[in-house]
Amino acid sequence: MRSFSFNGVSLSSLGGRITEAPFHTVASRDVEQVKIYGQSGDEVIDNLSYNNVAFSVKIAFITYKTAMSANDIARAVIDWLAPLQGAYYTYTDTWNPGYFTKARLTNFDEVKRELRTLLTATLKFSRVPFWYSNSGAVAITTTNGRLTLTNPEAYAAEPVIKITYTGTATNNFRFSLWINNVLLGYDGIAVGGITPEQYLDGAAKQHYKLSDGQKIYLSNILPPDIPAASASSYAARLEPNTTINGQDFIMSVTPNWRRL
């Protein structure tokens, strides 16, 4: 049986069925053609990114498949989707096993009207360009300061590197992070009692720490992408710039393997 889940809730758990499968297109490259005065032919500007993908799923609910009445079903689905407007949430389906993406529901008002009258609806979504593998969403951790990863996908990945200091020093000190023998940051990165845990987020393009759930920007140091499968491996090396014990560092890399 074909189904999908949105923000962790499966359509089938509500007695729903897909009546028309989504047509999943591959994200297109964000490219512009610009006319230059006096020049024959347009210039092509590659914005180095991909566009969102719009898709729809037609669903129906069968009352004999559940103990709920038709009105209860409509109410349950509306209660499920109503809080999920205006932001991205995790979307999975049975056409892409082992992968997830981030999608936004774009037509809640239409869905609300259709469900209350027909117990059918067409859900329209806008998703981010990539599908992310479940395995790539798992952090790989080391306490010896060294990790080597090889990307299994055909597209470069944007990793999140988390560095945690578990020692007893109460003042910040510095460490160096090397990726494929290239140093990130000339003066090292501060860590210690004041900033015991921090993130270098390749996807969000941010280097930050968390304080009361809020991101606090630390620097412009970012991890490079993990090359695609045909390229070389990705070696991360963490080294304290002082006599602090290297075993007091924990480094983890969430690789975020992805495909279009």
Identify the residue ranges that each predicted region occupies:
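Short N-terminal edge-element motif at the start of the domain
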Residues: 66-103
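Beta-strand elements of well-folded, non-transmembrane domains
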Residues: 59-63, 107-109, 127-131, 165-167, ...
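Short beta-strand and beta-hairpin "edge-sheet" elements
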Residues: 88-132
